A protein has these predicted regions:
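Short, Lys/Arg-enriched N-terminal segments with co-localized hydrophobic residues
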Residues: 1-29
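Amphipathic alpha-helical segments
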Residues: 110, 266-284
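Long, continuous compositionally biased terminal/linker segments
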Residues: 82, 296-327
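Short, amphipathic alpha-helical interface elements at domain boundaries
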Residues: 23-102, 106
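An N-terminal amphipathic alpha-helical segment
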Residues: 227-263, 270-272
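Short hydrophobic helical membrane-anchoring segments positioned at the boundary
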Residues: 140, 144, 149, 153-238
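Accessory beta->alpha helical hairpin/"wing" motif in late/C-terminal subdomains of nucleic-acid enzymes
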Residues: 64-89, 104, 118-159
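Short, well-structured beta-strand/strand-turn elements
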Residues: 115-124, 281-291
Length: 327
């Protein structure tokens, strides 16, 4: 039994190392800001502004300042690194809306030209409140293979033993400051993330300065309101995995689909919802995770619940799709 466990552990480490190598090889032509944008823009509204997208674009502006410095040799002085880091933080904090718009156009154009990002119908357009409103809703969708390669490569780098490159620490920091870290790491993994970065900070003052730097307080008022409003939902299987040790933004929306399906069980309702979404042009997969079945739409996973809403005092039956945050 011990030999089997040891073999499994070795295989896991080899797989993790392969993921690191795949990411380094496959993403060598992408800058830090582009790798970050592929992860963070995925699923965000492309036409209309939002607080979550603003956080992403501010982080992109910071990444552009930092990416040259992070790619330099370790011999560079701490004072130079610290100066660039402070410049990056200030850039993110003071970015104007017009500058945000310009950054979005630039980064989207580059990634779209490489077929790594595209605009698709936003699933929010299937929600009862938007379906017949006439409002056009579009969202960014990252290339699945590239998205997974960057995501799993970073997860392997951070969660497994061994040195963390300064560039990967920078990518993790950008995800933390823009509220994206919950998309990549579960609650239990976030404890490991904190532990690993604390270790790195003790050993190298550059990592310490990076991990202590913050620009998310620009959104602090919004996040505090969100926490007060949503905390009660954590008693239900909605928005699971929110760890308030790290900044959190409401990046993904739940969707209520109006459909009356009498005399059916949960599986029937799920099948009807899948059929409806496919007719709307969405690529939907049913993914079995433990005892439940999730819907994978694009790069995002959803739980599905039967639900009744009231509009103009009339009860309306349907299903609610709720983003799944991993525990």
């Amino acid at each position: 039994d011990l030999k089997w466990r040891d073999a499994l552990l070795v295989a896991h480490r080899v797989n993790s190392n392969n993921k690191r190598k795949e990411r380094k090889t496959g993403m060598k032509d992408l800058t830090l800001s582009q790798q970050y944008a592929l992860l963070a823009l995925d699923g965000q509204e492309s036409i209309h502004p939002s607080v979550a997208k603003s956080a992403v674009l501010r982080a992109v502006s910071a990444a552009r300042v930092l990416e040259t410095e992070l790619g330099k040799a370790d011999a560079d002085s701490f004072s130079e690194f610290s100066a660039e880091l402070q410049k990056a933080v200030q850039m993110a904090k003071t970015l104007k809306k017009k500058e945000e718009t310009q950054i979005e156009k630039e980064v989207a154009a580059v990634l779209e030209a490489e077929e790594l990002l595209k605009e698709v119908p936003d699933i929010l357009g299937c929600d009862m409140n938007y379906d017949t409103s006439g409002v056009e809703l579009k969202a960014y969708l990252s290339d699945e293979a590239s998205y997974i390669r960057i995501k799993e490569g970073l997860r392997a780098e951070i969660l497994e033993d061994g040195p963390i490159s300064l560039e990967d620490a920078g990518l993790l920091w950008l995800l933390r400051e823009s509220g994206c870290i919950h998309d990549l790491f579960s609650v239990s993994e976030q404890n490991r993330v904190e532990e690993r970065m604390t270790e790195a900070a003790v050993q190298d003052e550059k990592y310490r300065a990076l991990w202590e730097a913050e620009f998310h307080n620009v959104f602090e008022g919004f996040m505090n309101r969100f926490v007060k409003t949503k905390s009660k939902l954590l008693k239900n299987p909605y928005l699971e995995g929110v760890n308030l040790v790290f900044p959190y933004l409401d990046r993904r929306k739940s969707v209520f689909i109006d459909m009356v399906i009498f005399g059916t069980n949960v599986a029937d309702r799920r099948a009807a919802a899948v059929e409806y979404l496919k007719k709307k042009g969405f690529a939907v997969e049913e993914i079995r995770v433990g005892s439940e079945t999730l819907l994978k739409i694009g790069n995002i996973y959803y739980r599905i619940f039967p639900m009744t809403k009231t509009a103009y005092k009339v009860p309306i039956q349907g299903v609610n799709l709720v983003p799944a945050y991993w525990q």
